[in-house]
């Protein structure tokens, strides 16, 4: 396995000391996207929010600050990511505002129509089966809720065999049942934001 392959494996499912270092690097590297996320999230105070693939927990922290009266949930299938997310959000976890669980996007451990907003920040290109996983997201999203995918374009093109184009993603969202789909790009930074309303 090459060094690049090892780093990609750690980015997908961080593990151990190297995984923890990778998560800290991602927390810093993604701060610009977190700022951009704030502009497009439009979260109402009191919302129940899920971040899928919460990684090192920086996005959970951002979402918590945006939503002082709400609850923020995070899932990741990496045990190391869960540990690091809890550490990053220690006070909010202790007071019950942030709840973090080890889980897969393919089987989200919450009831139907539970969340007002669901985010997937730099993760959807790692999901096991994007079409079925988007259906699972739709299941736990409330009517009127929104699903936000945010990613760097080059990562989509590198990691994904299908759903590489905005039209393919838009068709997927429509086929699942999302009513209003908005695609926002920051060409200068190479960011893509897809918002689907249920």
Walk through the language-model features, giving the residues of each.
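A short glycine-rich, Lys/Arg-flanked "PGG" loop and its adjoining helix->strand segment in the class I
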Residues: 131-143
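Conserved SAM-binding loop of SAM-dependent methyltransferases across substrates and taxa
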Residues: 56-67
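Conserved beta-strand signature within the Rossmann-like core of class I S-adenosyl-L-methionine
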Residues: 145-151
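A short acidic, Gly/Pro-enriched loop at the edge of an enzyme's catalytic core
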Residues: 106-118
């Amino acid at each position: 396995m090459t060094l690049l392959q090892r780093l990609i494996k750690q980015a997908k499912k961080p593990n151990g000391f190297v995984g923890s270092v990778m998560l800290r690097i991602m927390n810093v590297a993604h701060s610009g996207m977190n700022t951009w996320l704030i502009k497009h999230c439009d979260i109402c105070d009191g919302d129940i929010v899920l971040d899928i693939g919460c990684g090192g927990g920086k996005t959970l922290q951002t979402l918590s600050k945006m939503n002082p009266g709400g609850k923020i949930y995070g899932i990741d299938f990496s045990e190391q990511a869960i540990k690091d997310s809890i550490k990053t959000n220690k006070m909010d976890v202790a007071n019950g505002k942030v709840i973090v669980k080890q889980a897969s996007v393919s089987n989200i451990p919450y009831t139907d129509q539970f969340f007002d907003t669901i985010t997937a920040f730099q993760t959807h290109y790692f999901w096991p089966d994007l079409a079925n996983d988007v259906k699972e997201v739709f299941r736990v999203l409330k009517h009127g809720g929104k699903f936000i995918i945010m990613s760097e374009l080059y990562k989509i093109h590198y990691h994904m065999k299908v759903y590489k184009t905005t039209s393919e993603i838009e068709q997927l969202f429509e086929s699942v049942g999302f009513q209003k789909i908005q695609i926002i790009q920051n060409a200068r930074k190479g960011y893509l934001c897809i918002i689907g309303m249920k």
